[in-house]
Amino acid sequence: MFPHEEKLIRERLGREPNEVEKAMLEVMWSEHASYKSSRPFLKLLPTENEHVVLGPGEDAGIVKFDDETWIAVGIESHNHPSAVEPYGGAATGVGGIVRDILCMGARPIALLDPIRFGPLEKERNRYLLQGVVKGIADYGNRIGVPTVGGETEFDESLDNYTLVNVACVGIMRPEHFVHSYVEEAGLKLVLVGNRTGRDGIHGVTFASEELSENAEEEDRSAVQIPDPFTEKLLIEATLEAVYTGKVRALKDLGGGGLTCASSEMAGKKGFGAVIYADRVPLREPNMTPTEVMISESQERMLFAVREEDVEEIGKIFEKYGLEWTVVGEIIKEPRYIVYWKGEKVADLPIDLLTEVPTIEWETRPYSLERDVETPKISFSDAFELVWSSPNVLNKRWVWEQYDHEVQGRTVVKPGRDAAVLKINERYGLAFVADGNPNHSHLNPYHGAMGAVAEVVRNLVSVGAEPLALVDNLNFASPERPEVYWSFAETVRGLADAARAFGLAYVSGNVSFYNEVVDRPIKPTPVVAGLGKVELEKIPGFGLEEGLLIGVVGSTKRELGGSELYVRLGLKGGIAPRVNLEEEKANAEGILEAIRRGLLKAVHDVSKGGIAVALAEMAVLGNTGFTADLSKVPAETSNPLEVAFSESHGRYIVVFPEERLEELKALFRHFAVIGRAGGSGAVFLWNGDELLRKPITKLREVHESFPKLLGEEE
């Protein structure tokens, strides 16, 4: 809390807050809980369209899938905790987002995990990766929720640090929807789940400041302890309770613990709450009321129910072996009062906890873009560099640790443009997350637009009509003027791109103060998207013998932030621009081509450019190709720029020759560049050979990720 905020609180109360009140206020006024630095900009984001049932403001967003099915979706970061204790930090990140979905009345059905680390040459970064992946895998597998996709990327700005973002979707019937706030006084507050301990105390305040060099020792107690077995019981018990129709409001205890859950539940519609902190079941002896109120012990939920329904709901919890207690009630008066063994230990106006004033920091624009001459290296050397990049390698090592098939809904599995989950006999839900900090670092506005465009392309590539978005904004300290400016520009880019596609953000997360000892991370907006797809229309992904290969979209000289430049250590360049008109037209064209059954396979072009997209399709289809890159619709005649530019709006399509004329009619920029077949990848330029590689060699490199961790495949 800043000195001017402490002064404001003293003036409002007319006195000094006592120890319990001060601890609760510190938690609720933290950046992590209050969004005080980000709220002024977040209101720019579009939050409504015909698919949105519930936009931002509760624990998760809700999207209409059809008349009988709604989808709850949310995204969270657990960056600081995972950097300090990677296993526990990542595991509790999964637990938290699953409970966010659960408390809307939805059954969690899938997770995505966009995760980022420093260079793998360093042992500490390998330790963080292995711990985070094991934490996500163990927790997700044990609660029976599949992890179906995500990103695993590496960047020098994350040395000794990690970004762990987790998105979750759940499925629900409209009649089971429960709000996270109350609409009447007199309700009893029932706490259920794990006992409360000292873990996670000041978790939100720790997440609202940069990490020190000794964070691993100093901040370990701020990381919560995961217990997936209790979470599994909590999922089933919560849904059974919700299905009775007698749960009036429901929140999980995440950041800020009991203070945050109960004050937000009561305060949203102007009610108050009385909490009897000494009734909370404790895991450790001699805990103080302060510790009880701000503990972030995991696997706990807070239910608001009418007095006459308490016993019925309680019996459900007992059936699952879960401990439950009435810890308070909702009152008419808008105050937040805490008792401890009969003594009043806190008494605050509830809006002092829930309505935190915003802060607008100084902004300072910067520009890192500058024209850079394309390097004069051979095509073969450039391809080897990019194809062997840790960001391009197949992450099978990661996703094979996750049970991605539990619940039996996963139709399109990890490793494709987007995962697809079966919702009913005819339709599936496509789910994907994307971000490109290298583009955002060069130009935060266009980097953010690009993240939205890539999500749309990934959804469209599996035949899905995009429905809605969620965003996770990972930034360094907002107190740095350049960082705050890049945040504002990012939100502007996210808003403009979503509006152009007619999409809305239904939930999101902001994580500031991602820096270690004065070293800020790059701006890293991560966007996750949902789409609806007809299951029998999903195209393939790999090449097939004898089929034509086409490129949709125009390639520009846009190598700034590209994988090629990163591998060569080149700074600057121009970040790719999104031509919204072309991006939309191409997405609509691809969807129409899929609807008509014109395409056998589709892959969007993104990281690594056309060269990488083609090689990935060859490896997946176990089929070679011959492709003349001089035929690609492009504004440059440099083979390296055509092959490795990361221009937006582009797709590789694979189709039988008889469909060519129909496809040509759908796109402004379209060309056949070659044919699939044989056992090698052959790149040409004006008929001359640039590179020839056997598929076996391509696969050997592509599957070599475990070697970077010192493991054999």
From Swiss-Prot:
Positions contributing to substrate binding: 77-80, 99, 224, 296-298, 511
Q: Where does Mg(2+) 2 bind?
A: 100, 252
Keyword 4Fe-4S attributed: no
Q: Which GO terms describe its cellular component?
A: cytoplasm
So which domain of life are we looking at?
Answer: Archaea
> Which keywords describe this protein according to UniProt?
ATP-binding, Cytoplasm, Ligase, Magnesium, Metal-binding, Nucleotide-binding, Purine biosynthesis
Chief localization: cytoplasm
SUPFAM superfamilies linked to this entry = PurM C-terminal domain-like, PurM N-terminal domain-like
Active-site residue list:
32, 78 (proton acceptor)
The entry's localization annotation reads: Cytoplasm
- Pathway of this protein? Purine metabolism; IMP biosynthesis via de novo pathway; 5-amino-1-(5-phospho-D-ribosyl)imidazole from N(2)-formyl-N(1)-(5-phospho-D-ribosyl)glycinamide: step 1/2
Disulphide connectivity of cysteines: none
**What EC class does the entry list?**
ligase
**What Gene3D superfamilies does the record tag this protein with?**
PurM-like C-terminal domain, PurM-like, N-terminal domain
EC number(s) per entry: 6.3.5.3
Q: Which positions in this protein are listed as binding ATP?
A: 35, 471, 508
- Single GO molecular function: magnesium ion binding
What residues does Mg(2+) 1 bind to?
A: 76, 509
Q: Function of this protein?
A: Part of the phosphoribosylformylglycinamidine synthase complex involved in the purines biosynthetic pathway. Catalyzes the ATP-dependent conversion of formylglycinamide ribonucleotide (FGAR) and glutamine to yield formylglycinamidine ribonucleotide (FGAM) and glutamate. The FGAM synthase complex is composed of three subunits. PurQ produces an ammonia molecule by converting glutamine to glutamate. PurL transfers the ammonia molecule to FGAR to form FGAM in an ATP-dependent manner.
- Which family, according to UniProt? Belongs to the FGAMS family.
Kindly state the subunit structure of this protein.
Monomer. Part of the FGAM synthase complex composed of 1 PurL, 1 PurQ and 2 PurS subunits.
- Protein's UniProt name: Phosphoribosylformylglycinamidine synthase subunit PurL
Annotated organism of origin: Thermococcus kodakarensis (strain ATCC BAA-918 / JCM 12380 / KOD1)
Give the organism's phylogenetic lineage: Archaea, Methanobacteriati, Methanobacteriota, Thermococci, Thermococcales
